[in-house]
Amino acid sequence: MKLENKNTIGFVGAPWTLLVYMINQQSPKKNVKKNFFDDEYLINRILLIIEKFLKIHIKNQVENGANVIQIFDSWAGLLEERDYPNFIYTPTLNLVNYVKSLNIPVICFPRDIKNYKEFCEIVKPDAVNIDYNVDPLTIQKNIKIPVQGGLDPKILLTDQENLKKETLKYLDIFKDHPYIFNLGHGILPETKPEMVEYLIKTIKDY
């Protein structure tokens, strides 16, 4: 489906995050089966298989109208920095290069990663989505590519005054930087629709 004058963003989970869900069989917020992850050889083999099928999924989305692809690594923060090269950088870079080979821009979201600057330098996405635990000023100073996101979804559970304050903070910090306003993670189920409407109005009125 192609929409005139609109970008259609396709998305996939990053290989590491999909592996976590496959092995854990649930959200790993409370329970992570860590013993499995000691077998580095097995992990790398599975990541390659996941990567193969993700490329098929990406191609299908592009052929059906997606003109941007976003890669979500929701559980990047589970890893120690020493594990980033094998489990995050290499598999994600392979996907980024594949998306670019289709002449499609790619956004990456390595949630809770400890070094966004290093990630961007190695993986080379066209834009990066940041989470709400990172300092936006540090990102603005250190990241040269377009930035997306950052606002804590819990802010939408407060009041309009607080929501406007936090929203304007991000808009002010990134006013001279290519920036796509978004949340620093998914919207929470209990969020009131009128708060989302107020957020959108605040952004449009800026």
Where in this protein do the model-derived segments appear?
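Active-site loop segments of alpha/beta catalytic cores
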Residues: 1-206
